[in-house]
Each structure stands twice: as C-alpha cells, then as structure tokens.
Amino acid sequence: MLSPTNSISKTAPVPPQDSSKPVLISEEPQNQLLQKVARTALAVLLVVVTLGLILLFYSFSDLQSFPWCCQTRPSTKEQPTISIPVPLPSPPLAVPRPSTPPPPVISRPSTPPAPTPAISPPSTPSAPKPSTPPPLPPKAPKPVKTQEDLLPFVPEQVFVEMYEDMARRRIIEALVPAWDSDIIFKCLCYFHTLYQGLIPLETFPPATIFNFKQKIISILEDKKAVLRGEPIKGSLPICCSEENYRRHLQGTTLLPVFMWYHPTPKTLSDTMQTMKQLAIKGSVGASHWLLVIVDIQARRLVYFDSLYNYVMSPEDMKKDLQSFAQQLDQVYPAYDSQKFSVKIAAKEVIQKGSGSSCGAWCCQFLHWYLRDPFTDALNDLPVDSVERHENLASFVQACEAAVQDLPELFWPEAKALF
C-alpha cells in the first residue's frame, strides 16, 4: 500500500499494456515553471520600456554617435538629408552626395517616423559655401630685409676713431688735473704779483649764477666808498685785513669773478648744499667753473665758458649781461660817461676731450687777458685737442710751481697808492 504523502508526489505504476496514456505532472513543478515564465516576461517588458525611454529622450544623431549603434546600408528610396554636426571649432556643411544616397531615418516602431531637422551649434556662424569664397584683400608686399638692415655694417675707421678718442681723453686727463677753489685762489694771488690792478677775490665760497651780480655790485660800492674815504658797507674777506682790503680796492682796475655752476640745483641754497656734498665726496661731478671779468678801466664785461654753452646759449647770456651792464652804469658811472660793453669770449667748446680742466682754462684765459686785453688769444689755439691741452699743461705746471712760495689762503699785501 502507498502512504498518503507519497500519493501526492508519486504516481501509481502504469500497466505495461496501457503505454499510450499521458504522464501526469505534479502541481509544484508547474508553479515553478510559471514563475520563471513570468519573470522572463517581466524582464523583457522592462527592456522594452527602457529602450522606449531611450528612444524618447535621445535624438537620432545622439543614438548614432553611440558605439553600439548599427550601421545600416543606404536604401534606394529618396530620404530627406540629415545634417550631422561635428564638434567645434570647425563644423562642416551637410552637402548631399550624388553618388551615395543619404542614410534612412531611424524611428521607433510604435510611432510613425518624423523628419528630424538639421542640428547646428547656435553660437557658430554659418560658413560660406565652398563654391563662392569671399574675395581676399590684396596683400601688401613685404619689405625685403637684407643683411645690412639686420646688422648694419660699421666701417673700421669708426672703431679706430673711437679708440683714438679714448686714448686722447686719457692723455688729456693725465696732463691737466682738476683745479679746486684753493688752487684757483692761489693762482689769482700769483697774478696779482704780476699785475697790480687785479684784485685776488676769494673763491671760498665762490660766486654762483644766482649771486654773482650782487657780489660785483657790492665790490664796486665798496670801491666807491674807499675812494671817498668812507667806511666799507660790504662784508670783509675771510683771509684779508680791513686795511689791506681797502688798499686792494683803491688800486684795483679789474675784478675776476669765478662762478661755480651745477646744472641740478635751481636756487642759491640748493647750489651751496650741492657744493658741500661734492666737497665731502671729493668729486667734481657735473660742476663747472665760469669766469666773468669786470674791466673797470676799459668799461667791459667779458664772459668766458670753456664749454661754450653749458649754462645757457651765448646769445641769451649776452642779453642778460647787457642788461646787467646798464645796471653797472648806474652803480659805478664813468667820468666820461662811457658805458659798459659785453663780450662773449668763447666761440666754441675749448676743453674738448676733458671734463675737469675748466678751472685751469679760466685761469689761462685770465692770464691771456691780463697780458693783452685787446687781442683774442683764443683764435690762436691749436686745432688738435691733445696739442691744445699740452699747452695748457705747461701753463698749469708753471702756476703750480709759482704758488708754492705763497702763503696758504692769505691775500698778498697790496701797495698803497699814496
């Protein structure tokens, strides 16, 4: 006999003669089969829905750009041309090819196919058609650069002249050293021993372009006071007694006024400050010595600048001195009513190739003027700058040897006229 549990899961033995009857299947395997079929159908449904959503949210051009997109063969049926954009920066134009028909439109099976318009970047302007390119403007001819334009040829003579100038400057600087105010004052004291009419005015502190006129007027006022027997109103020199100074003023006929000039300061106080700074450093810098000769006997103002126009142009300086000469006519009139005249001595740059010989040149010109005030010695200067400074070096050596016996920074004793 069979148990009740086995009756559900197992079948009764089939007689051999009845083999044509169907074999019965239990209910539990049948349920499992139905579950598998349902799961498969659900998976297929999800795949179909997913593909449908993809088709809804992606255009044809996006689908065709995927790597799994199938490549279809072109059909013979005429289809509208679809322009597929290419990423920037150079999108090509969609031009139908006569030999190859365009690809068909891929659409969903549930909805009828619809033509897709051409897609192009909104910010990209349409390019011109290849068949009608715009005319190009004519190009300007490029200048032809030769080797001379890139590397200009420098003649060998230029290098030779540069070397000669450098050698000449070194020779000149070795011949004529820079003269300071002490050497210039000693030179004036030496000139006084040769020409009694010259007054050796102190050069410490020297006159400047801002106060030389006041200094000349003050000396002439003191000279008038001495001639009248009156006391001196101006300040006395530092290294000269009052009696000796009065004797110098009484017999003087020529005032050599040395001016110290620097192009940077614009006032008298700034000039004195610059002078002090250069003296501490022991450097001449851009300073320059100028000379104004006041010839009382000849009633003449003579201006000498070895650099010719270092302060201002000779024309402007002459106009300024002519105005000052009219003022001197009122301050120190002549007995015969003769007026002061003005002369600009230098007609060119005298100290060529040297930047520190201005003081020596001023003393050299003063010495020439004392020997003969009516002869222009500058006309006889050598043309060659080295030869010119060799002559100046001879004068400098003679002066330096002569002033060695003079007292240190003291005025020489003037002789009384009566």
Swiss-Prot record:
Residues 1-10 have a biased composition (Polar residues). InterPro entries: Papain-like_cys_pep_sf, Peptidase_C48_C. The chain crosses the membrane at residues 40-60. Its EC number is 3.4.22.-. Effector proteins function to alter host cell physiology and promote bacterial survival in host tissues. This protease possesses deubiquitinating and deneddylating activities. Belongs to the peptidase C48 family. GO terms for molecular function: cysteine-type deubiquitinase activity; deNEDDylase activity. It is found in: Secreted; Host cell; Membrane. It comes from Chlamydia trachomatis serovar B (strain TZ1A828/OT). Residues 1-23, 72-144 are annotated as: Disordered. This is Deubiquitinase and deneddylase Dub1. Keywords: Hydrolase, Membrane, Protease, Secreted, Thiol protease, Transmembrane, Transmembrane helix, Ubl conjugation pathway, Virulence. It is a single-pass membrane protein. Residues 86-141 have a biased composition (Pro residues). GO terms for cellular component: extracellular region; host cell; membrane. The active site is at H288, D305, C358. GO terms for biological process: protein deneddylation; protein deubiquitination; proteolysis.
